[in-house]
Amino acid sequence: MARIAGVDLPRNKRIEIALTYIYGIGRSLSQEILTAAGVDMNTRCDNLTEAEVTKIREYIDKNVKVEGDLRRDISMSIKRLMDLGCYRGLRHRKGLPCRGQRTKTNARTRKGPARTVAGKKK
């Protein structure tokens, strides 16, 4: 079983798909990594040689921000927005959508379950 960036990749899947189990790597980035490392995309994880795994691991370490580093960067960006006090930061602070979606009727994912207000009947 190949272990890259602290993640155990599933053995039975193609390496192109298996790399997407790493946080921060999707299909297109996975294909880019494999092309740069010179590894066939249709190879199964358990058929990879140690040299191929090393090439993939080195490319990811050198060129791609994944897992903990990426999570930390994202949370620091959100924290920076909140500290600035800009509109997006305020929306993050209040737990509301920050990209212009309507909130009168929808946005239940960000706002949480609906709380009934007494005396709000028409």
From Swiss-Prot:
Tell me what gene encodes this. Answer: rpsM
Q: Which PANTHER family match?
A: 30S RIBOSOMAL PROTEIN S13/40S RIBOSOMAL PROTEIN S18, SMALL RIBOSOMAL SUBUNIT PROTEIN US13M
Q: Which residues form a coiled coil?
A: none
Q: Subunit info?
A: Part of the 30S ribosomal subunit. Forms a loose heterodimer with protein S19. Forms two bridges to the 50S subunit in the 70S ribosome.
Q: Name one GO cellular component term.
A: small ribosomal subunit
Similarity comment text for this entry: Belongs to the universal ribosomal protein uS13 family.
Q: Name one GO molecular function term.
A: tRNA binding
Tell me what this protein is called.
Answer: Small ribosomal subunit protein uS13
Q: Does the keyword Ribosomal protein apply?
A: yes
Region annotated Disordered sits at: 97-122
Which SUPFAM superfamilies does the record cross-reference, listed alphabetically?
S13-like H2TH domain
What is this protein's function?
Located at the top of the head of the 30S subunit, it contacts several helices of the 16S rRNA. In the 70S ribosome it contacts the 23S rRNA (bridge B1a) and protein L5 of the 50S subunit (bridge B1b), connecting the 2 subunits; these bridges are implicated in subunit movement. Contacts the tRNAs in the A and P-sites.
Q: What is one process in the GO biological process aspect for this record?
A: translation
Q: Enumerate the UniProt keywords alphabetically.
A: Ribonucleoprotein, Ribosomal protein, RNA-binding, rRNA-binding, tRNA-binding
Q: Which InterPro entries match?
A: Rbsml_uS13_C (IPR027437), Ribosomal_uS13 (IPR001892), Ribosomal_uS13-like_H2TH (IPR010979), Ribosomal_uS13_bac-type (IPR019980), Ribosomal_uS13_CS (IPR018269)
Q: Does the keyword Ribonucleoprotein apply?
A: yes
